[in-house]
Regions:
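Conserved SAM-binding strand-loop segment of SAM-dependent methyltransferases
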Residues: 36-43
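Short, well-ordered coil/turn residues at beta-beta hairpins
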Residues: 58-59, 177
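Beta-strand-loop-alpha-helix segment that lines the small-molecule cofactor/substrate pocket
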Residues: 54, 60-61, 65-112, 127
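N-terminal Rossmann-like dinucleotide-binding module
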Residues: 1-34
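Short active-site oxyanion
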Residues: 14-18, 36, 53-55, 161
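Predominantly a Rossmann-like dinucleotide-binding segment in NAD(P)-dependent oxidoreductases
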Residues: 111-199
């Protein structure tokens, strides 16, 4: 619903044509709430039946690649929620579909457009911070684990927990601020155990 709410703030630029959700009742509610002409429970049917300029993919992570690729192949531009997909091979398939279609594919890495990131970018470009050669990031979440027990905490559907969900923003902003340098070396480690109880 967050994407639809944002799009509805741009009535001169965006007309919401159709809404798709595997839960039909929710699709109908969202279509009614945002004056969409149609609702669907299958994105393939939506792409077959509707003439769309842009598709916004805001599904569980494991569905990003199939939905985005289908939309690109149907001739639509695509805004896909982050992370792009679960594996580099799937992301490459998305890029290949974009290149073949001639359409645009944007991943929702919105933090680079925040005021703080834009200010930091200006400072970096002006040389106010010297040569940037290292970035260290962290994120503390005080509101618990979102969607515990649902797709968000199921690795096969989410892809790997906080690093892929939240860490991707920091990786993106760090690379953006440094001008997307070619890495010399990369190392990493993930840990995806969730506590049974919150303190």
């Amino acid at each position: 619903g967050k994407h639809l709410a944002s799009y509805s703030l741009l009535p001169d630029d965006i007309q919401i044509i159709a809404v798709c959700d595997i839960r039909g009742e929710r699709a109908d509610q969202m279509a009614d709430a945002y004056n969409a002409e149609a609702s669907y429970t299958d994105y393939k049917e939506m792409l077959k039946n509707e003439k769309l300029d842009l598709v916004s993919v805001a599904t569980p992570n494991h569905m990003h690649a199939p939905a985005a690729i289908a939309a690109l192949q149907a001739g639509c531009h695509v805004h896909c929620e982050k992370p792009a997909s679960l594996t580099p091979a799937l992301v490459q398939s998305m890029v290949d579909a974009k290149n073949q279609s001639g359409k645009k594919l944007m991943i929702g890495l919105n933090n680079r457009f925040t005021n703080w990131a834009q200010l930091a970018k200006k400072w970096v470009e002006a040389g106010r911070l010297g040569e940037i050669y290292h970035a260290k990031c962290g994120w503390k979440r005080r509101r618990g684990i979102p969607g515990k027990g649902g797709w968000f905490t199921t690795k096969a559907q989410s892809g790997g927990g906080p690093l892929i969900d939240l860490g991707v923003h920091f990786l993106d902003v760090s690379n953006y601020l440094m001008g997307f340098p070619e890495p010399v070396a990369v190392s990493g480690q993930t840990y995806s155990k969730f506590a049974d109880k919150q303190a």
